[in-house]
Amino acid sequence: MKKLKIIFSFLIVVSCSETNLDKFTFSTWVGAGSKFDKNTWTKKINYYDSLGISEILVGGSPDILKKIIPLANKKNIKVHGWMWTLNRPGDTIANKNPDWYAVNRKGQNSLEFRAYVDYYQWLSPFHPDAREHIINNAKKLIEVEGLESVHLDYVRFPDVILGADLQPKYNIIQDRELPEYDYGYHPIARKEFKKIFDKDPIDFDYPELSTEWRQFRLNTISTLVNEIISIAHSNNKKVTAAVFPFPEMSRQMVRQAWNDWNLDKVYPMLYQNFYRENINWIGFATKQGVSDVDFPLISGLYSPALKNPKDLERAILISKENGAQGISIFTADGLNKEQQKVFIELSNKLNQ
């Protein structure tokens, strides 16, 4: 009889685990701002809960996150700490160290020459002090009790190629890798590369053809991420990341090889309109990402490009059909009434 009880208990645990694994997660990115207001966040949490959202990726200081977590816990909503990793606009510590910043092929520093937009102020993953600063930022989030994960964003180089729909907005035609947008040429990087290959990448006529030079830059991002993950895991904290659509695409566009990272979960941003693609592309990118990694994938969706509720519904369903374990919307705060209805209906339907 005792053995039967043990077996029965085991089956219950397994059944619960399988149910949890089968759950299709609805989540959202949200900025917390610089000040915490309990009433505002209570309303936000209730709103997210009404939509079936069970996880929120919050951009805010550790102190603010500590105040949001207890409110979210009341609704069984998990809170992730959304961290801008290498792009550090307004970072007062980094600003005092111009040599920490990424350098493009023209020799321009990212603090002084800000590609595309003013908030593009990128640190170089090759500079040891910049790396230490980034890791220290992650450690502050790792220490937050009850935080579901450290959620890394902007963990890459600046876009060497923008999405097709974004280029006209900046009056740019990027039919090749232009030197002012091609980053990774920090003096430390060039010196280390030359030690190995006896070549300075700044002298390459066609640097985009050097697989060694691309891989060299990919590796420095990957080692940074995996170091953060190692520290987090040793403190029983998960690490997730918002990334470009699928590994091959992200390698080319932003020097980001996220299939080489030891993540607990990944959130590729499948914003199809940026690339002038259709809803089917979301399914393609999801399937490609799922096939490239052995950790869970959550499809990131862009609400302004899915204002038609039928498009939003199709984007969610095609993500699930192609192996995603959930979706994350940018952002739930911007959903119209019809989009909200889709969330409510599908969050119930897909998790019955």
Task: Walk through the language-model features, giving the residues of each.
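The substrate-binding groove and active-site-proximal loops of carbohydrate-active enzymes
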Residues: 30-34, 53-59, 116-132, 209-220, ...
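Aromatic- and acidic-residue-enriched segments that line the glycan-binding/catalytic groove
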Residues: 87-115, 155-202
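Boundary/entry segment of secreted carbohydrate-active catalytic domains
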Residues: 18-44, 241-245, 304
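Active-site-adjacent "subsite" loops/lids of carbohydrate-active enzymes
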Residues: 80-144
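Catalytic domains of carbohydrate-active enzymes, especially glycoside hydrolases
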Residues: 34, 38-64, 144-149, 260-266, ...
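Substrate-binding cleft of secreted/luminal carbohydrate-active enzymes
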Residues: 263, 267-281, 285, 295-352
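Short, acidic/polar
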Residues: 33-49, 130-141, 247-261, 281-285, ...
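Aromatic-lined carbohydrate-recognition surfaces of secreted/lumenal glycan-active proteins
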Residues: 151-158, 183-252, 296-306
